[in-house]
């Protein structure tokens, strides 16, 4: 009897985490200049992340030169993998050679499309490149929750070493980091993130759309903070109320809220 050969490959359904870039103009010169201004000096920002281009916010008569946008993103170390478009946009959008993709982020709630777009779709994965304004809370919150084993939910990941530039950690539950998260390092979790040291890199919590996820740290100095795809970068200085201090970050009405923590 001949032995059955093991298959050399398999094809199955799956999902891939990706950033979602939503241009609001088809003026490629202006768009390229703005992307370069924001990210050229921080090449580790994208760090070879895959990115989908969402053209649904463009006006009906606008045609974005997607090939030029792909070139700009490649120069910034982002890898474009496809285009998200409305049925009316599909014809011209796919003419640039990228596949059409489905997006499973939350849709605007109705009303004026432009106003709803400004409120931001909450995208999946590591979030769309749109800045959410940080709301300052007037009152301090209680001390950072304990990270002892009894308090942890199943699937919590603990990292007890410093994370250097270029290192990335992904947790399918909560993530606890007991040492420094350096500039250029990235911590990602489907649940909450706790950093018991300086947070200087990127922290992305609730990356599968968990709007209740939070980020806690004992020294807030990040390059980027994101919850459920809504994020803010350190390009604008962090307010003194929580900069380089213990803080937590949460979502309220699709807006990032930063609150100082009382450490006792």
From Swiss-Prot:
GO BP terms: cell morphogenesis; division septum assembly; regulation of cell division; regulation of cell septum assembly
Keyword Nucleus: no
Annotated keywords: Cell cycle, Cell division, Septation
Biased composition annotated in UniProt, kind: Low complexity: 124-147
Record Gene3D superfamilies: 2.160.20.70, 3.30.70.260
InterPro entries (alphabetical): CAP/MinC_C, MinC, MinC_C_sf, MinC_N, Septum_form_inhib_MinC_C
Basic and acidic residues compositional bias, start-end: 110-122
Annotated segments matching region Disordered: 103-147
Entry similarity comment: Belongs to the MinC family.
Function summary: Cell division inhibitor that blocks the formation of polar Z ring septums. Rapidly oscillates between the poles of the cell to destabilize FtsZ filaments that have formed before they mature into polar Z rings. Prevents FtsZ polymerization.
Subunit structure: Interacts with MinD and FtsZ.
The protein's name in its UniProt record: Probable septum site-determining protein MinC
Gene: minC
């Amino acid at each position: 009897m001949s032995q059955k050969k093991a298959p050399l490959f398999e094809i199955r359904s799956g999902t891939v985490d990706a950033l979602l870039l939503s241009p609001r103009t088809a003026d490629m010169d202006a768009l390229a200049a703005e992307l370069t201004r924001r990210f050229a000096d921080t090449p580790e920002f994208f760090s070879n992340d895959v990115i989908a281009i969402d053209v649904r916010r463009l006006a009906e008569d606008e045609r974005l030169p997607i090939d030029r946008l792909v070139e700009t993103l490649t120069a910034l170390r982002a890898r474009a993998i496809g285009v998200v478009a409305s049925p009316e946009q599909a014809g011209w959008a796919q003419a640039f050679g990228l596949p059409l993709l489905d997006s499973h982020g939350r849709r605007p709630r109705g009303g004026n499309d432009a106003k709803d777009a400004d409120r931001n779709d909450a995208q999946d994965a590591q979030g769309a490149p749109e800045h959410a304004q940080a709301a300052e809370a007037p009152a301090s919150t209680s001390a950072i929750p304990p990270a002892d084993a009894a308090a942890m939910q199943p699937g919590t990941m603990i990292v007890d070493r410093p994370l250097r530039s270029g290192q990335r950690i992904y947790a399918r539950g909560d993530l606890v980091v007991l040492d420094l998260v350096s500039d250029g390092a990235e911590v990602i979790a489907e649940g909450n993130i706790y950093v018991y040291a300086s947070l200087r890199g990127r922290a992305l919590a609730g990356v599968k759309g968990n709007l209740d996820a939070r980020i806690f740290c004992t020294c807030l100095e990040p390059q980027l903070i994101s919850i459920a795809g809504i994020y803010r970068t350190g390009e604008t200085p962090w307010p003194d109320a929580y900069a380089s201090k213990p803080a937590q970050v949460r979502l309220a009405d699709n807006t990032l809220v930063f609150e100082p923590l009382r450490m006792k």
